[in-house]
């Protein structure tokens, strides 16, 4: 009865209501159907199919799995040196620079490509780069993907997934911590590629100090770990002022300066090293003890 009363009104907007109803139905039923279908054709259902060139290759993966300082990267780099062409993918600019230095020192011409630096060596067929800079359109005999456990990183993990699915190399070496092995294997098997797993074990024991020590108790060969450039510089100033020559390393330090700081520590021109946790990503240093200046780190969002 109420509806009939409204319709009986002289000024009731029947035409407008009908137009609105048809428009609502059009938006709800017609538009999604005819937009969704083309989008489904453009967006691959399976991420591996976004890399057709890699799918045409028969790739073989060698996974080096183990804890820190177990020789995973070393073994991979030895194979990379033997290849006619190759690419090394690092999580950090510092590590890419380190590998470029190693290859060039050993007579293998190697270029460098990171988000901040580009060092193109004439006639080089090898390249060391950060993982995000991988050229998916270039073929390499050997590809080394380092620190692959970072595939779980919320912000950067996509780059390791992209490298595994899309790198155009017949032989791919992956270095990873045990925690990521299952995920990496699933990705490789989804591509239909072959894989072998090499387990690496630490040859030196790790021992924990029974209690904290003071700065006055530091000894030559110790590394103090801080979690910011500001804190690194503060501790370095304190140790230098106390008569302990100190080297420093942090992520934003220009590579030539970092190389100089590392060389001074290697030659024992400095007693101590003060660094961020960036040195934990594959840098090989003769550190006697690792001393954390704090047990908390701000990861950009939270302190943990």
Show the residue positions of the predicted features.
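N-terminal accessory nucleic-acid engagement/regulatory domains that precede
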Residues: 1-33
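Conserved two-lobed SF2 helicase motor
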Residues: 66, 122-142, 265-284
């Amino acid at each position: 009865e109420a509806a009939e009363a409204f319709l009986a009104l002289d000024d009731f907007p029947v035409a407008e209501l009908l137009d609105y109803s048809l428009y609502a139905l059009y938006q709800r039923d017609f538009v999604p159907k005819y937009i969704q279908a083309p989008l489904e054709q453009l967006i691959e259902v399976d991420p591996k199919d976004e890399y057709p060139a890699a799918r045409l290759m028969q790739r073989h993966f060698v996974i080096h799995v183990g804890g820190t300082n177990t020789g995973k990267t070393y073994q991979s780099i030895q194979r990379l040196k033997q290849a006619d062409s190759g690419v090394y993918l690092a999580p950090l600019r510092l590590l890419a620079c380190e590998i470029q230095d190693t290859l060039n020192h050993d007579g293998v011409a190697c270029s460098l490509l990171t988000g901040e630096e580009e060092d193109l060596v004439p006639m080089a067929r090898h390249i060391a780069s950060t993982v995000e800079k991988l050229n998916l359109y270039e073929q390499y005999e050997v590809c080394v993907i380092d620190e692959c456990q970072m595939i779980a990183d919320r912000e950067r993990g996509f780059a390791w997934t992209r490298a595994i699915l899309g790198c155009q190399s017949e032989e791919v070496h992956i270095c990873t911590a045990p925690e990521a092995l299952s995920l990496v294997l699933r990705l490789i098997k989804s591509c239909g590629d072959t894989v072998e797993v090499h387990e690496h074990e630490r040859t030196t024991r790790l021992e924990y100090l029974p209690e904290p020590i003071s700065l006055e108790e530091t000894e030559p060969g110790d590394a103090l770990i801080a979690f910011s450039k500001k804190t690194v510089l503060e501790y370095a100033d304190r140790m230098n002022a106390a008569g302990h020559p100190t080297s420093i390393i942090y992520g934003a330090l220009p590579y030539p300066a970092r190389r100089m700081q590392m060389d001074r520590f290697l030659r024992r021109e400095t007693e101590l090293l003060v660094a961020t946790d960036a040195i934990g990503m594959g840098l090989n240093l003769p550190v006697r003890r690792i001393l954390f200046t704090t047990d908390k780190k701000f990861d950009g969002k939270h302190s943990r």
